[in-house]
Amino acid sequence: WEDLLTDTDGQYIELQSGRVFNQPASNSAYTPYKHYAFAPQMTDEWTEYWYPVKGIQGVSKASRIGALHVTREAGSLKLAFSPLEVLSTDVKIYQDEKLVETLPLNTKVLEPVTLSAAKSIPEGHLKVVIGDDLLVYSENAKDYDLERPMTLPEDFDWNSAYGLYTQGEQWLNQKVWDKAELYLKQAVDKDSYFAPALVRLSSLYYREGRYAEALPLLNTALSLNTYDGEANYLYGLVNRVMGKTAEAKAAFSIASFAASVRTAAYEQLGEMYACEKNWAKAEHYAQKSLEFNEMNLDARQLLMLVYRQTGKTEQAKEQIQYVLDRLPLYHAARFEEAWLAGKHTADQLKDFSSLIRNELPFETYLELAGWYERVGCPDEALALLACAGKYPIALYQSAYLLSQQGKETESKAALEQANAQSPDFVFPFRPETMKYLDWAQTQSPNWKIDYYKGLIYWTNQQKDKALEAMNRCTPTDYAELYLSRAQLKSGQARLDDLLKAEQVETSWRVGFALLNYYTSVSDWQKVTEVGKKYTKLYPKNYYIGLKYANGLCETGQYAACVSLLKKMEVLPNEGSYAGRAVYRAANLYQAMDLIGKRKYASALKSIEASKEWPENLGVGKPYDDQIDSRLEDYLEAKVYDGQGQQEKAKACFNRVAEVKTSPKYFESARLLTALALREVGKQIEADAMVTSWAKDFPDSKPAQWCAAIYKGDTTKASELLKSRYSQQDTTPWEATYRDTNFDLIVRLFK
């Protein structure tokens, strides 16, 4: 894709290393290499080094001083080094533990150096040391191999309370809230007194603002162990939100016994005393918090506030400087610095605001304002909200706080302004925002308030409440309301909202949503109608184009599909595969039709075309040995068989039969392998393969379907297709298997 790069340096490779053993994917949860999570208010610091490597043709080992590439050429040892520092040191070359040679090394930054050793060391026995262990490269496996377990016990019971809890906790750590709730609830159902699951589930409910659901779980956990640190910490958080001050203080006090939540518990106590203007106790608990985590930023901010409120200006400045020396863009400290200097209005805070440059700056102001409101400082909160300009959620919060201060005229003005704003790019998600919206709805009812409430419920896994809120929205000309609400519905109700959105607004997003709906219900005629309409409106939008092409393919308009794809420019992106998948399917479906009509020469042309990887479709061609062409080869065999060219047919069947399959997952092309084995006279081997599927992949519907087809049981095969296999959604970088052949093979055997 060099022509798509924004530089002219050609192709490049980015090598990555990290703090943990792997870059965890979803399925890492089922290995020892779990997803890591941070403890409340803990600060974790590490250093990452990013640097270029040039002129050494590869990397054998890298460190903070540079990268080394070791090669052997004609019996000699070559050491190429790309330095990051000016060095004047030496390189020691060992055979096992025996020093063989020492070479001088003098470098300038990024000026590659190549050294040649007098003697080549046998592979597996070389060790290279630069300077005083500045970089150590060893080919001896014992220098790297660890004896720690690398696989999960085979008999680990994922359906036990602990197994279900582990799955829930791992989804929680990945921020996949719906799956986390599913597994944690199953763990509690399995064992209603399994404390870790009770605590984790309550933490999820707290995060989602479901306080009434969290409280009974925490009561159960505390009835098992009144000193459970995490349970007490969460019990404190929930009770604090619910206004039960004594309960919250007691809970945080007991939580401080546990090292995992101690720093956070003390800081929470400090906040509560700050809210009561008990500055001495607020300072005491902030200091206690810092004893266990000197970089607890909330505790530092609390001290800044305490010292400012008690007139200890120099101590406040010391705290501010301590943080800014380490984190120059920590906006809470910058705000305290500005407030201390007497800058209390949005105009006066322009210098402060000038460095808040993220894509959603109003979220930074809302986060800071929420903290000041929690510690009883509404003036500071209002000043921060004013910096957010006309962002509706900030205006609703301002209106609420102004009303709390008795400033009803200003409150009403802010509320009217909030209701007048467009909902475009407004994505509220914090549960605590709900109280401002509930209040606003009692003061000045407006459909936008219900829409915002629906978004908050939705993002916090309360889809029924989200739909209730959005259903209360009166008819409006805001298409995004209908698009959003449609995703909370199903069937005809979903389609009705999508059609309402289309009546209100013609946009590619509306068209794409309609195409997704019709695709989901396999209404391919509608896909082609809507696809044709929106492709004319948005000819360069390949998201629309690919959906339209898929519709053409599924309705048998193969030539039109391929023609459309040839005109399309799909930008390559991580995990994308759709463009080439539709192209391949169109050609192979056409080949199947042509074989059925005995047009063998034309069928061969379609099969050959299916093997191409057109660059304009945005999917890179893998290496040949990574391409599964069993379906293409099987169809070719059928063509040659139909033409009476038995030797060519047998050669194709042999290619299919010889493919080695992965033991990790079931691919539907195994059916073709089994059939090919049978075609070349290896019936026993084919039967054994099919029999093994039930044992190796007992829950795989595709495996059961393939076995039914192999055995000629078309009735069972048809029944299995009613519960279609669906690919689990994953992130693009995950090494997940996608069976690209299943739909094609289903069509073949229809």
Enumerate the language-model features and the residues they cover.
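A contiguous, surface-exposed recognition patch within enzymatic or periplasmic domains that forms
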Residues: 1-43, 51
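Long, contiguous interaction/recruitment modules in multidomain scaffold/adaptor proteins
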Residues: 60-159, 331-333, 404, 408-433
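Residue-level recognition of tetratricopeptide repeat
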Residues: 160, 169, 194, 203, 228, 237, 262, 271, ...
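Structural marker of alpha-solenoid helical repeat scaffolds
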Residues: 190, 224, 257-258, 292, ...
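TPR alpha-solenoid repeat register
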Residues: 197, 231, 265, 299, ...
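Canonical tetratricopeptide repeat
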Residues: 200, 234, 268, 302, ...
